[in-house]
Amino acid sequence: GMVFQQFNLFPHMTALQNCIEAPIEVLGMKKEEAEERALELLELVGLTDKKDQHPSRLSGGQQQRVAIARALAMRPKVMLLDEITSALDPEVVGEVLNVIRSLNKEHNLTMIMVTHQMGFAREISDRVCFFNEGKIFEQGPPEKLFGDPQNDRTKQFLHAVLDAN
């Protein structure tokens, strides 16, 4: 499953409809089963009460959580989360990060996350890769990469972003 910084929800569909479209069309799931699964996922992301709302009636954080539920509706083994908080108002970033924390703890889902949320990456990751100019400069467990980076470019980046916070 993939979720990007732009939510890419279908604007003419409700949150529920956004979550059932692919399972019905791609997986051949029955509508009732897809709706039941979608409601469970909307509950997981804290949006059951918004199931009948179109994306234009949802905040950015709510749209992103619908996008996460929609991706999960396909029952992926791996989730790619690409800068999922970068387009959000800073006050709602926590809503989305809390959903990811829950997925990480309770659902044992493998996630590959591209983020500039260094504190979150350190907290939630089993392994961290530092990319620069399209190449992996350094990788390892978060304790090692954040606590004792070996590469000068990694040190420079972490110093800049961690000191800014």
Would you name each region that the model predicts?
Residues 139, 143-165:
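C-terminal boundary and immediately downstream tail of ABC-type ATPase nucleotide-binding domains
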